[in-house]
């Protein structure tokens, strides 16, 4: 019985050892097949990746519409990258991957790192540019508001200046009409004044020739007015001015024609005109005597005043007309110059012409200020447009970068999908092979168990034969010993 147990234990050990060897051989075959398959698959994957990259480069214009897909699959791409890296590491550790696959993995890692860095730098630069652009836009908005306020103020002042210029123009036109009317009236009455012209010209040389148009004038009512000068030389209208009523020559002729005959018409007309002229001469020279006496007393003071005004006006020689009009004391300067021309008996009144052009010069100054403001506004708007164009260029560059990254992710996703489909097909084949191998293993185990049973039967027979052989050997030895003992007795 003990021998049977020993033999049975040995048989069990042999069976287990054989089963272990069979399982190790099966695992080795599976691993070798897996390594061969993975190596071939990785090589095919590299070829396919290169083909896909070339196809994606040729069709990059058609894949710009897939940016939304890249945003949704961005997070999954990082997991897939990690999965690819882990699979690559495990395949290198287990299978000893080739150098070409290492280079491909390094290129993929470098591309991913550059894309991540580019995204970070683009985000940071975009945030910084947005902050700078916001600050610059606020400053420019404030400057534009200031310019608009200045333009509104300039427009208001322009309206006021236009009103002033229109009023001044109307005044100048009125004065020109008055001067024209006076010149016409003076030319019409030159015959009546011819007799007193020589004495009046001598008086006018003493009093100043600038009052020639204003000292004697005929208004629309027909009244003649004589002007005197005060101590300062400024002409003022006297309260007791001599007013001579206008005589109608036609009425006089009509009266003479009705009262007298046609033969005495000419003589009566001459007598009437002579009376009018004599009366006017007496009244005029009676008032002019007081004026000449007053002017003779103040002639020395007038010359001193002229010299003082000349010295004062010489200070403004270095100024241009634009600068002169822009001064705050322009009205005082203008009054001083007008007074100088009046006292110095200037033949041409330049100051009146300057006063006429004053509004034009001021309007030119305002226009230049408006031009400067408009130029500043144009420059600001140009800077804003340039900044907006820079933002457009930055956004376009970001769109291009995202499009390129989307193309690369699409290529990776496509390659991974093909890889997964091939792995699934390979897994199916491995499962089918595994099932077949398991069935074969069960059959082989049955055959091995039968062989071990036959072996155990043969061993048992061998042991029995060996036991019988030993028994026969012992019996032979005993017989030999008995035979020897028998022979020793002889």
Curated annotation (Swiss-Prot):
One of its GO terms (molecular function) is ATP binding. It comes from Arabidopsis thaliana. Contains a N-terminal NAI2 domain (192-490). Residues 136-163, 433-465 form a coiled coil. This is NAI2-like protein. The keyword Iron does not apply. Residues 184-199 have a biased composition (Low complexity). InterPro entries: DNA_mmatch_repair_MutS_con_dom. It holds the Pfam family MutS_II. One of its GO terms (biological process) is mismatch repair. The keyword Signal applies. Residues 171-183 have a biased composition (Basic and acidic residues). Residues 43-83, 155-206 are annotated as: Disordered. Keywords: Coiled coil, Signal. Residues 1-24 form the signal peptide.
């Amino acid at each position: 019985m003990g021998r049977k147990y020993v033999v049975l234990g040995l048989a069990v050990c042999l069976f287990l050892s054989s089963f272990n060897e069979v399982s190790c051989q099966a695992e080795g075959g599976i691993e070798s097949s897996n390594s061969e398959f993975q190596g071939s698959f990785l090589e095919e994957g590299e070829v396919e990746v290169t083909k896909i990259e070339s196809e994606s480069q040729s069709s990059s214009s058609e894949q710009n519409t897939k940016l939304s897909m890249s945003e949704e699959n961005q997070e999954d791409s990082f997991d897939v990258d990690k999965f690819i890296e882990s699979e690559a590491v495990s395949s290198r550790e287990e299978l000893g991957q080739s150098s070409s696959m290492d280079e491909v993995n390094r290129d993929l890692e470098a591309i991913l790192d550059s894309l991540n860095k580019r995204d970070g730098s683009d985000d940071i630069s975009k945030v910084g540019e947005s902050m700078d652009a916001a600050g610059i836009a606020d400053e420019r908005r404030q400057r534009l508001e200031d310019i608009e306020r200045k333009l509104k103020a300039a427009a208001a002042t322009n309206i006021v200046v236009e009103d002033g210029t229109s009023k001044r123009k109307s005044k100048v036109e009125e004065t020109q009409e008055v001067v024209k009317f006076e010149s016409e009236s003076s030319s019409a009455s030159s015959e009546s004044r011819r007799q007193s012209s020589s004495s009046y010209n001598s008086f006018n040389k003493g009093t100043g020739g600038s009052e020639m148009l204003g000292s004697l004038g005929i208004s629309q009512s027909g009244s003649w007015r004589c002007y005197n000068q005060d101590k300062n030389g400024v002409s003022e209208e006297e309260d007791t001015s001599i007013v001579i009523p206008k005589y109608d020559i036609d009425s006089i002729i009509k009266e003479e024609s009705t009262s007298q005959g046609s033969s005495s018409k000419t003589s009566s007309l001459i007598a009437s005109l002579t009376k009018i002229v004599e009366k006017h001469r007496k009244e005029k020279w009676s008032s002019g005597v007081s004026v000449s006496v007053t002017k003779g007393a103040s002639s020395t003071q007038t010359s001193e005043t002229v010299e003082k005004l000349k010295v004062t006006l010489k200070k403004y020689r270095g100024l241009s007309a634009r600068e002169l009009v822009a001064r705050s004391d322009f009205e005082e300067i203008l009054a001083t110059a007008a007074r100088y021309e009046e006292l110095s008996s200037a033949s041409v009144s330049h100051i009146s012409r300057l006063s006429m052009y004053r509004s034009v010069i001021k309007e030119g100054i305002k226009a230049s200020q408006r031009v400067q403001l408009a130029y500043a506004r144009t420059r600001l708007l140009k800077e804003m447009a340039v900044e907006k164009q820079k933002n457009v260029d930055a956004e376009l560059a970001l769109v291009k970068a995202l499009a390129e990254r989307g193309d690369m992710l699409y290529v990776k996703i496509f390659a991974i999908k093909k890889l997964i489909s091939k792995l699934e097909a390979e897994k199916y084949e491995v499962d089918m092979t595994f099932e077949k191998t398991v069935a074969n293993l069960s059959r082989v185990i049955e055959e091995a168990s039968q062989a071990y049973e036959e072996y155990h039967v043969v061993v048992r027979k061998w042991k029995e034969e060996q036991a019988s052989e030993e028994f026969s050997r012992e019996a032979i030895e005993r017989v030999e010993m008995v035979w020897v003992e028998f022979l020793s007795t002889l």
